[in-house]
Curated annotation (Swiss-Prot):
This is Zinc finger and BTB domain-containing protein 24. CDD domains: BTB_POZ_ZBTB24_ZNF450 (cd18212). One of its GO terms (molecular function) is DNA-binding transcription factor activity. GO terms for cellular component: nucleus. It comes from Mus musculus.
Length: 710
């Protein structure tokens, strides 16, 4: 009902005595439905959705925490060092003004309320003790557990809640009997009280219509000395449900509860006064928290010595929780549990949109914001929005002048130091993750996990259009782009379009090599002569039958080949470059040198018709010539780029030789081959193809070998 008070100036001031309860009831309904909740509080892996504004208005802890962040806020917070059941009851009090708890948990709830500075509850409990200094035997609920129901209504009869239908008579009678047996009720008005000195205005048991509201100015929230006093409101129609406490307990009992370790403490001006005042309000039954726990290194103050002990590990470097797999230490047990999932590969949280699996629910919630497009983090300098806090932190360097972490080798920049650390492995060659099955090493843990799926034959990611399966989710995403028909990546040199970025990057290398080849043509003849080196291929064994041969596709840039084939393997050489240069160059010859002639079953020369007559000589040391050509099963392509690598070898650097389907790596070694004509050491290329690699039924005919060059 509303009260209308005439004013001398002719204005009316209308006040509703049910508005505050209506707003709180609406917010509580929104919280239960997750509607318009802008913050998630995680306590013992239990997620509580809430409204940030209401938390800040009810708790100085949250108010100060949000004020410290300023405009750079976030939507997910981890509160460690609390019990999920206790925090759930406290959160219900913030939204309803009622506390339903057993006597044995009341002390723990009050300790949490004092820590979070929910002074309305502290005040309500102090009034509760003052009014019941000689309390009656507590009433028992249906389970026989003593229950304390706190509200700020005194000696009011129980009535049904506003707007709700009456329950069955049996339930009403049971609740009346429960109240008659001595259930104590004290309802608290959730208005903002004086947070500094606990100055509360005592209200008599009168109707709100008989009071005159007082308007008082208050300082901004979060500043010392802020005072905003609002008269307490009395709701004559309010009727707490006896089943609310049971419902809350049953809801919390289904949550996964475990011991927490740490909770960040926010130090406010006047905290010492607040603590001493709170002790006086709670009376002698309140257990003293003892002397303050102060860190000697940073002078930070904690309410409990347990939190101080955890905090001091930052200064001492103590990491008591060790990983059994790698020996890495952690300051908190929870951090160790998350780290252990890296070794086990456990990723229990999966994105329902893209199927990506993550190790923690916090990571999943942050990842889901990428799909929803929700950008909860705003830059207070330029107003730009971000979906992740680390993105905002990286962006903030633009305004602060701090540069992003940069690689000293390639000058590439990264969002954080951890990403730079992973990138540096590509330069240093460090591969700390090794496959236990085949011994292959990787620079990233994710690459090892994908590799292990190949051994196991696991392909959990399938294309929804064609059904093709993949062992890596990124490979599936790249594949799905092909079905769209879109080619958003265009070559700036020739305008050729590609559906995938990696294909464009591979294409751009062709242009860069063409430019490099054009520049190298202007090199003096002496340098070219020095570049004509011996390409030494180390022993290479195919995993297939002995009748299959190895085919070398060479160019006019390579004149001598030292190759040691495996047992019962044939070798064929295919000339695949312009005949004009070979005809004009008197040194244009291909020499196959073998150190194990008894293992060479056959040597085959296969060239295009117009090229065969321009090859001046084919020298063979060991082995014998055959005129027939068997079907090629493995092709090793040696193109003009070999000359570039020979120049690099001349400078004592390691470089890669393009080899189709081999992934060959070039390393300089001293020449041990008898009969070497050049003084320079040959370039050794250890060939390591994939197991069972074969190109049987190769689609290119002999006249198309030119297209095989890299």
């Amino acid at each position: 009902m509303a009260d209308t008070t005439p004013e001398p100036c002719g204005q009316l001031m209308v006040h509703s005595d049910t508005h505050s309860d209506t707003v709180l009831a609406s917010l509580e309904d929104q919280r239960k439905k997750g509607f318009l909740c802008d913050i998630t509080l995680i306590v013992e892996n239990v997620h509580f959705r809430a409204h940030k504004a209401l938390l800040a208005a009810s708790s100085e802890y949250f108010s100060m925490m949000f004020a410290e962040e300023g405009e750079i806020g976030q939507s997910i917070y981890m509160l460690e060092g609390m019990v999920a059941d206790t925090f759930g009851i406290l959160l219900e009090f913030i939204y309803t003004g009622y506390l339903h708890a057993s006597e044995k948990t009341t002390e723990q709830i009050l300790a949490t309320a004092q820590f979070l500075k929910v002074y309305d509850l502290v005040k309500a409990y102090a009034d509760f003790q003052d009014n019941h200094s000689a309390p009656k035997p507590p009433a028992l609920n249906c389970t026989g557990t003593p229950v304390v129901v706190i509200s700020n209504k005194k000696n009011d009869p129980l009535k049904r809640k506003r707007g709700r239908p009456r329950k069955a008579n049996g339930l009403q009678e049971g609740r009346s009997e429960l109240a008659a047996e001595g259930e104590l009720q004290l309802r608290v008005n959730n208005s903002v009280q004086n947070r500094q000195n606990f100055v509360f205005k005592e209200e008599d048991s009168v109707k709100l219509s008989e009071q005159t509201p007082e308007d008082k100015e208050s300082e901004p929230a979060g500043e010392p000395g802020s005072v905003e006093e609002v008269p307490a409101e009395k709701d004559e129609n309010f009727d707490p449900k006896a089943g609310d406490g049971q419902e809350s307990q049953s809801r919390c009992s289904r949550r996964r509860i475990r011991r927490s370790v740490k909770l960040k403490d926010y130090k406010l001006l006047g905290d010492e006064d607040d603590q001493s005042t709170a002790k006086r309000l709670c009376g002698r039954k309140k257990r003293s928290s003892g002397p303050e726990a102060r860190c000697k290194d940073c002078d930070r103050v904690f309410k409990y010595s347990h939190f101080l002990a955890i905090h001091q590990r930052r200064h001492t470097g103590e990491r008591p929780f060790k990983c059994n797999e790698c020996g890495k230490g952690f300051a908190q047990k929870h951090s160790l549990q998350v780290h252990t999932r890296m070794h086990t590969g456990e990723r229990p949280y999966t994105c329902t949109v893209c199927g990506k699996a993550l190790t923690t629910k916090h990571s999943l919630l942050e990842h889901m914001s990428l799909h929803s497009g929700q950008k909860s983090f705003t830059c207070d300098q330029c107003g730009k929005y971000f979906s992740q806090k680390r993105q905002l932190k990286s962006h903030y360097r633009v305004h602060t002048g701090h540069s992003l972490p940069e690689c000293s080798h390639c000058h590439r920049k990264f969002m954080d130091v951890s990403q730079l650390k992973k990138h540096l492995r590509t330069h240093t060659g460090e591969k700390p993750f090794t496959c236990e099955i085949c011994g292959k090493s990787f620079t990233a843990k994710s690459s090892l996990q994908t590799h292990i799926r190949i051994h196991r034959g696991e392909k959990p990611y399938s294309c929804s259009i064609c059904g093709k399966c993949f062992s890596d989710s990124s490979a599936k995403r790249r594949h799905c782009i092909l079905h769209t028909g879109k080619k958003p990546f265009s070559c700036p040199e020739c305008g050729l379009q590609f559906a995938r970025l990696d294909n464009l990057k591979a294409h751009l290398k062709i242009h860069s090599k063409e430019k490099h080849t054009a520049d190298s043509s202007s090199v003096s003849g002496s340098n070219v002569d020095e570049g004509r080196n011996i390409l030494q291929l180390q022993p290479y064994q195919l995993s297939t039958s002995g009748e299959q041969e190895i085919q070398l596709l060479v160019t006019d840039s390579v004149h001598n080949i030292n190759f040691m084939p495996g047992p019962s393997q044939g070798v064929s050489i295919v000339a695949a470059e312009s005949p004009q240069s070979m005809a004009t160059d008197p040194a244009a010859n291909i020499t196959l040198l073998t150190q194990q002639p008894e293992q060479l079953q056959g040597l085959i020369l296969s060239a295009q018709q117009e090229q065969a007559e321009h090859i001046q000589s084919l020298s063979v040391i060991g082995g014998q010539m055959e005129s027939s050509q068997t079907e090629p099963v493995h092709v090793i392509t040696l193109s003009k780029e070999t000359l570039e690598h020979l120049h690099a070898h001349q400078e004592q650097t390691t470089s890669s030789v393009p080899a189709a389907d081999t992934g060959a790596r070039a390393t300089p070694v001293p020449s041990t081959r008898p009969g070497a004509e050049l003084t320079q050491a040959p370039l050794a290329v250890p060939l390591d193809p994939s197991p069972g690699a074969t190109v049987a039924g190769w689609p290119f005919g002999p006249s198309s070998y030119r297209s095989l060059k890299m």
